[in-house]
Curated annotation (Swiss-Prot):
UniProt protein name: Carbamoyl-phosphate synthase [ammonia], mitochondrial
Modified residues (N6-glutaryllysine): 55, 171, 176, 207, 210, 214, 219, 228, 237, 280, 307, 310, 402, 412, 453, 458, 527, 532, 553, 728, 757, 772, 793, 811, 841, 856, 875, 889, 892, 908, 915, 919, 1074, 1168, 1183, 1224, 1356, 1360, 1479, 1486
Keyword Nuclease attributed: no
Gene name as annotated: Cps1
UniProt function note: Involved in the urea cycle of ureotelic animals where the enzyme plays an important role in removing excess ammonia from the cell.
Domain notes: The type-1 glutamine amidotransferase domain is defective.
Segment annotated as transit peptide: 1-38
Entry-linked PROSITE patterns: ATP_GRASP (PS50975), CPSASE_1 (PS00866), CPSASE_2 (PS00867), GATASE_TYPE_1 (PS51273), MGS (PS51855)
Enzyme Commission (EC) number: 6.3.4.16
Subcellular location: Mitochondrion; Nucleus, Nucleolus; Cell membrane
Length: 1500
């Protein structure tokens, strides 16, 4: 029977796709569906028919004529105009693996260069017989484009169809070998034709002799076997007078300085006249150099006496790695051949190059004569230019004269690597998460440890981030020793002394590790202790970090950077700006995430930003602003053998002026021509080589949108956020490979772990596209603008994978915010646009909501040209965004009866969710899902394999798409699903990734198959070797159900990923998903604060007076009855979103409005706020209502500070035993009442012996990693075993009856804040969480542990003066603290009233003026001046709600933060700090394992 596959169709870009039931490997089905009208003229249907009977339907965008030929595929990521005009494709129907073709339109096909050759093409026209693509972009945009790709194909009468699952087609060709095929239109039947039986070389060769570069000194005869124009250009450029002769021309009697044979298509063995002519040359006495390219390699080999064969799988693409056998140098090459030489080379000849992947011949050379040939294309176009140097070698042979061999003129390798002999390596982590330095370093550090262990190298890890996976002390993938200590030169030196490592890795710990390593180098510590920095040298790091050195280095190789000056004073900065001209950009040296950077349109802005920058660094760069240019990034890997690959290139949708961490980013780049792509790639490689990078680095470019002008912005000589994104986008494990390279292992010897077969020395091909969208939480920070710029503000990000931009873009928007349906003019969290919205300003000034403003502008019919003018976003992206809104409008005009299958399918293919569609059609989400499934529309599961299906893959790295026709995998494992945490944001950070990874690892240790779903590229849980199947997908009801049912999972764990998966518990349960652990109905009861409080009353468990309120009047009545302050809490939220302590009626009105918006479906609970109480955390694991593991930790701060911002102590330090017993008893009752089986957390207020419950979360909490590591019991391991019904030995667990309480050490967990990045935010703690990360350290007592933890957050112990500003009510308690600080030798400053009070109580203090009163009293110094000149290096600012000087206190806090000065705003923390400084004069470098060893020794 005939096998027919209906093609995918995709919106305006002419696409449409159809999902089908599970397919069998035999592909025995027959589907046929009508196309839909998308353009003004309905696209004609056509079929691609293969000789094995496979028939796939598509839609025409070329010439509507049938054609037959050989079907081949190309995995290149760009350069389709060059590829289509490559004569080597003569007679072939080309399948493009790149999922979107036509973005850049077609260039001027009549334009000629100075040689008379077609300027933008590789021959005189399109040479492919036909073209097959998945998605065709009819809307195009490029400054060189003159028409669409479809118009060009029609002009040249070449058929082309879109809507074919090209990945599926590639797999058929890969598995069965290249095969004959035909594109057939109805009524135009054609027979199969085998072009390999034709002498295609004769068809494409010139018919006459032609001369190019007439008068040039070197005469080169070029035999045209289908030569590409670029070969001629490169020869003339080097001084050749090129005589282009037909393939059968007798050149044996011609005089020449060099002979070149290049091409071409078909079977070279059919070109017998040419082979005989070459044979005459080889056997004659002629010694002029001969250079063969592609077909020329086989022609030369056949002439020499070797044999050729047709390859089962041709090499066609732009990422083929070849190895020079003579010197082990590897190169990435462009290839296009289906025949190869075998290993029958005669005497006198030997191989020159070999393919690293399939070991086929890639070049030959004569051992004594100047004859050589290569199978790949050194002239490229399209493709990488790595081997263009072979043309130089050819000319060197010509100049050297006769009798020279190619090896004598090939460039020698710059480096020859040797294995770095190290036995123990110290890896520096990045510390707690902060804006600009987040969870990506947990991922990279974990990969580095894994790589070292594979090579039998011992590892010592130093990282105080206790929530990270890498700091686990037990496990096959963990370091041999873990130090929870500050990443500072002092502590690293102590660890080096104690551990005596012989190697040090700096590139896996972000800017923190890099800066620390540079300082250790400068101090001579590394030299003193014989520690080698592995990978990139410190000198190279300094050259990338020091702005002047960086500029000098690039000038050495004449590379393009923006005109700039590195300055070390504000005066010089102003002079530099005057020289360059405004606007200018400033950047700080040794800074992270654009900290200390900004665009300065004028002198005033420069003074403001420059002053703040100099507070953080001693050097800034003032450079020309390239705002509005495109921002392009490359991730480059270089080994110690000087082999270089560019693993991924990425394009920022937002133009220059927005930090890449705050930009929407796509991979691969979508709007670059081949010339632009390769220009920037070549520059990347040159720069990385010149800087001496060994390992991985990121290079960022600004590219002019309408010319080839570019400049280098910066190089990061380390793993970065972009590196993590590139790793997850491509499947190429950059950190793992970089760690191997650091040991001196060359790239060709490292395996590609995804394919399991090929080498890591390659550049991934993507047959999908990725969109990254940042996650901001700017609303949490009072006073912070939503504007974004060159200094990063986002706290996390998501990555979505699709096969159209629209699909991945809409998925990413939903991943970022569960409240967002897709690309829509509605703001996240259902917020309203302001009534006085200035839409043009919203577009021209980038902000965290600009993407929604673009949707609003499109909805308002603003022209694309106007949006381009205001945003500088490439028009191609805006076309796609417009297509989404057009579909939205179409759907809104339909209902469930009138919506056709084609329209519904098209909506799904461009990323519409069921929920999104339901709102348009007036249905529920469940009804839309039912409608979709009824129409047999469902998604397909595809693999990320790094190779665009070119090689069979063992990968378990998956995504879901509606743009396909088959699944890539089988679904026969029925694993347990684990839901990850989604994007990092305030309140959900790396601790939930730790929980997910712990659960996954436990399941695998128990022999259970795992299916993980997450969408965060910074996580370890999205490392594909952590689980059995990884779905990089949305954490939405729709997508989880899709995957759960497709995989037929045995259950789903939702309690280890934080609030996002927890919120899905009830909806999943109602849709038949088996939720492991505590019943979702119980979770719902606990999450609804009013129900939970009612249950506590029934249990007679004490809590503060409370009331669930639905109206403002109810809230005001309750507050008046119990008295202010009150605590206002919405339900189903994480990290205290919209939670506030309310002190007045006005605040109640304001906060209640916000709370109802955050949690609209649930009532808000008001509780009487208990002042002066201490908060206690109970982290526990329940088993069928019994508590089998628990840990009790105490907050340093009194209640009122969110638990995520609190400083935790374990064991408790001030809580009475009586209160602890009450905490345990309440926990016991709650566990039983809610029948808890799994992890949970209860928060209590303790005041004396009174214990009140605050709230309970029936899921893992952010303190689980902290308590697990401190007590040495993995609570998530225990919880996972409970949830799946595994038996547990409870004797070793910290039960309520037999707690584990450390007696020889104290653990302190401290929060990390990112205030310097959040310009204008008030750095003070409230009920709503503000911290971005956490650290933990250990000490024999609370004081040493506390100081280590504070130092780990970047806190600097003051050396000079302390500014004290306290509200009057704090005075009685604060006097003792002030005395302690004075006795420790600190000079105290205070505002007038506080100063008078301190002096009156015999504590000397210098009075200073409030900021608002500066200059009024000449005898009072300016606080801001004292802070900025370093006289004050700690600010203690303790206001409360009754403070009069609200704004002054804010200015003081903000000045401290902006000046890089330590700031304390909580009395209890200040008190503990004063005690710690007094009692711990020195801080040791002991960590957890030291204390554990001591405890074990005592017990023994």
């Amino acid at each position: 029977m005939t096998r027919i596959l209906t093609a995918c169709k995709v919106v305006k870009t002419l696409k449409s796709g159809f999902g089908f039931a599970n397919v069998t490997t035999k592909r025995q089905w027959d589907f046929s569906r009508p196309g839909i009208r998308l353009l003004s003229v309905k696209a004609k249907t056509a079929h691609i028919v293969l000789e094995d009977g496979t028939k796939m339907k598509g839609y025409s965008f070329g010439h509507p004529s049938s054609v037959a030929g050989e079907v081949v595929f190309n995995t290149g990521l760009g350069g389709y105009p060059e590829a289509l005009t490559d004569p080597a494709y003569k007679g072939q129907i080309l399948t493009m693996a790149n999922p979107i073709i036509g973005n850049g339109g077609a260039p001027d096909t009549t334009a000629r260069d100075e040689l008379g050759l077609n300027k933008y093409m590789e021959s005189d026209g399109i040479k492919v017989a036909g073209l097959l693509v998945l998605n065709y972009s009819n809307d195009y945009n490029h400054w060189l484009a003159t028409k669409s790709l479809g118009q060009w194909l029609q002009e040249e009468k070449v058929p082309a169809i879109y809507g074919v699952d090209t990945r599926m087609l590639t797999k058929i060709i890969r598995d069965k070998g290249t095969m004959l095929g035909k594109i057939e239109f109805e009524g135009q039947s054609v027979d199969f034709v085998d072009p390999n039986k034709q002498n295609l070389i004769a068809e494409v060769s010139t018919k006459d002799v032609k001369v190019f570069g007439k008068g040039n000194p070197t005469k080169v005869v070029a035999v045209d076997c289908g030569i590409k124009n670029n070969v001629i250009r490169l020869l003339v450029k080097r001084g050749a007078e090129v005589h282009l002769v037909p393939w059968n021309h007798d050149f044996t009697q011609m005089e020449y300085d060099g002979l070149l044979i290049a091409g071409g298509p078909g079977n070279p063995a059919l070109a017998q006249p040419l082979i005989q002519n070459v044979k005459k040359i080889l056997e004659s006495d002629r010694k002029e150099p001969l250079f063969g390219i592609s077909t020329g390699n086989i022609i030369t080999g056949l002439a020499a006496g070797a044999k050729s064969y047709k390859m089962s799988m041709a090499n066609r693409g732009q990422n083929q790695p070849v190895l020079n056998i003579t010197n082990r140098q590897a190169f990435i090459t462009a290839q296009n051949h289906g025949y190869a030489l075998d290993n029958t080379l005669p005497a006198g000849w030997k191989p020159l190059f070999v393919n690293v992947n399939d070991q086929t011949n890639e070049g030959i050379m004569h051992e004594s004569k100047p004859f050589f040939a290569v199978q790949f294309h050194p002239e490229v176009s399209p493709g990488p230019t790595d081997t263009e140097y072979l043309f130089d070698s050819f000319f060197s042979l010509i100049k050297k004269g006769k009798g020279t061999t190619i090896t004598s003129v090939l460039p020698k390798p710059a480096l020859v690597a040797s294995r770095v002999e190290v036995s123990k390596v110290l890896i520096l982590g990045s510390g707690g998460l902060s804006i600009g330095q987040a969870g990506e370093f947990d991922y990279s550090g974990s990969q580095a440890v894994k790589a070292m262990k594979e090579e039998n190298v011992k590892t010592v890890l130093m990282n105080p981030n206790i929530a990270s996976v890498q700091t686990n002390e037990v496990g096959l993938k963990q370091a041999d020793a873990v130090y929870f200590l500050p990443i500072t030169p002092q502590f690293v030196t102590e660890v080096i002394k104690a551990e005596r490592p012989d190697g040090l890795i700096l590139g896996m710990g972000g800017q923190t590790a890099l800066n620390c390593g540079v300082e250790l180098f400068k101090r001579g510590v590394l030299k003193e202790y014989g520690v080698k920095v592995l990978g990139t040298s410190v000198e190279s790091i300094m050259a990338t970090e020091d702005r002047q050195l960086f500029s000098d280095k690039l000038n050495e190789i004449n590379e393009k950077i923006a005109p700039s000056f590195a300055v070390e004073s504000m005066e010089d900065a102003l002079k530099a700006a005057d020289t360059i001209g405004y606007p200018v950009m400033i950047r700080s040296a040794y800074a992270l995430g654009g900290l200390g950077s900004g665009i300065c349109p004028n002198k005033e802005t420069l003074i403001d930003l420059g002053t703040k920058a100099f507070a953080m660094t001693n050097q800034i760069l003032v450079e020309r602003s390239v705002t509005g240019w495109k921002e392009i990034e490359y991730e480059v890997v270089r080994d110690a053998d000087d082999n270089c690959v560019t693993v991924c290139n990425m394009e920022n949708v937002d133009a220059m002026g927005v930090h890449t961490g705050d930009s929407v980013v796509v991979a691969p780049a979508q709007t670059l021509s081949n010339a632009e792509f390769q220009m920037l790639r070549r520059t990347s490689v040159n720069v990385v080589r010149h800087l001496g990078i060994v390992g991985e680095c990121n290079i960022q470019f600004a590219l002019h949108p309408t010319s080839m002008e570019y400049c280098i912005i910066e190089v990061n000589a380390r793993l970065s956020r972009s590196s993590a994104l590139a790793s997850k986008a491509t499947g190429y494990p950059l950190a793992f490979i970089a760690a191997k390279i650091a040991l001196g292992i060359p790239l060709p010897e490292i395996k590609n772990v995804v394919s399991g077969k090929t080498s890591a020395c390659f550049e991934p091909s993507l047959d999908y596209m990725v969109t990254k969208i940042p996650r901001w939480d700017l609303d949490r920070f009072h006073g912070t603008s939503s504007r974004i710029g060159s200094s990063m503000k986002s706290v996390g990000e998501v990555m979505a994978i699709g096969r159209t931009f629209e699909e991945s873009f809409q998925k990413a928007l939903r991943m970022c915010h569960p409240s967002v349906d897709g690309f829509t003019p509605r703001l996240p969290m259902n917020k309203e646009w302001p009534a006085n919205l200035d839409l043009k300003k919203e577009l021209s000034e980038p902000s965290s909501t600009r993407i929604y403003a673009i949707a609003k502008a499109l909805e308002n019919n603003m022209s694309l040209d106007e949006i381009v003018r205001l945003t500088s976003i490439d028009k191609w992206f805006l076309y796609k965004m417009r297509d989404i809104l057009n579909m939205d409008k179409t759907l809104k005009g339909l209902n469930s009866d009138s919506v056709t299958e084609e329209t519904l399918r098209k909506a799904k293919e461009i990323g519409f969710s069921d929920k999104q569609i339901s709102k348009c059609l007036g249905l529920t989400e469940a009804q839309t899902r039912e409608l979709r499934l009824k129409k047999n529309i469902h998604p397909w599961v595809k693999q990320i394999d790094t190779l665009a299906a070119e090689y069979p893959s063992v990968t378990n790295y998956l995504y879901v798409t509606y743009n396909g026709q088959e699944h890539d995998i089988k679904f026969d494992e029925h694993g347990i699903m684990v839901l990850g945490c989604g994007p990092y944001h305030i309140g959900s950070s790396v601790e939930f990734d730790w929980c997910a990874v712990s659960s996954i690892r436990t399941l695998r240790q128990l022999g259970k198959k795992t299916v993980v779903v997450n969408c965060n590229p910074e996580t370890v849980s999205t490392d594909f070797d952590e689980c059995d199947k990884l779905y990089f997908e949305e954490l939405s009801l729709e997508r989880i159900l899709d995957i759960y049912h497709q995989e037929a999972c045995n259950g789903c764990i939702i309690s280890v990923g934080g609030q996002i998966p927890n919120n899905l518990a009830v909806p999943l349960y109602k849709n038949g998903v088996k939720i492991m652990g505590t019943s979702p109905l119980q979770i719902d009861r606990a999450e609804d604060r009013s129900i939970f409080s009612a249950v506590l009353d029934e249990l007679k468990v004490a809590q503060a007076p409370w009331k669930a309120v639905n109206t403002l009047n109810e809230a005001l009545e309750f507050a008046n009855s119990v008295g202010y302050p009150c605590l206002l809490r919405p339900s189903y939220v994480l990290s205290g979103s919209a939670m506030n302590v309310v002190f007045s009626e006005d605040e109640m009105k304001r906060f209640l409005e916000e709370a109802t918006r955050v949690s609209q479906e649930h009532p808000v609970v008001l509780t009487k706020f208990v002042e002066g109480a201490r908060e206690v955390e109970m982290d526990a694991v329940g088993k069928e209502g019994r508590v089998i593991s628990h840990a009790i930790s105490e907050h340093v701060e009194d209640a009122g500070v969110h638990s995520g911002d609190a400083t935790l102590m374990l064991p408790t330090q001030t809580i009475s035993q009586g209160a602890i017993e009450k905490v345990k008893d309440a926990t016991r009752k709650i566990a039983k009442a809610f029948a808890i089986s799994g992890p949970f957390n209860v928060q209590f207020l303790v005041k004396g012996n009174d214990v009140l419950v605050i709230e309970c979360n029936l899921r893992a909490s952010r303190s689980f990693p902290f308590v697990s590591k401190t007590l040495g019991v993995d609570f998530i391991d225990v919880a996972t075993k409970v949830m799946i019904g595994e038996s547990i030995d409870e004797k070793r667990l910290p039960t309520l009856e037999q707690p584990i309480i450390p007696s020889d050490y104290v653990a302190i967990k401290a929060p990390m804040f990112s205030w310097p990045r959040l310009r204008d935010a008030d750095p003070i703690l409230r009920c709503e969480m503000a911290s971005t990360g956490e650290v933990a350290c250990f000490g024999e007592g609370i004081h040493t542990a506390f100081l280590k933890a504070m130092l780990s957050t970047g806190f600097k112990i003051p050396q000079k003066g302390i500014l004290i500003g306290i509200q009057q009510s704090f005075r009685p308690r604060f006097l003792g603290v002030a005395e302690q600080l004075h006795n420790e030798g600190f000079k105290l400053f205070a505002t007038e009233a506080t100063s008078d009070w301190l002096n009156a109580n015999n504590v000397p203090a210098t009075p200073v003026a409030w900021p608002s009163q500066e200059g009024q009293n000449p005898s009072l110094s300016s606080i801001r001046k004292l802070i900025r000149d370093g006289s004050i290096d700690l600010v203690i600012n303790l206001p409360n709600n009754n403070t009069k000087f609200v704004h002054d206190n804010y200015v003081i806090r903000r000045t401290a933060v902006d000046s890089g000065i330590a700031l304390l705003t909580n009395f209890q923390v200040t008190k503990l700090f004063a005690e710690a400084v007094q009692k711990s004069r020195t801080v040791d470098s002991k960590s957890l394992f030291h204390y554990r060893q001591y405890s074990a020794g005592k017990a023994a």
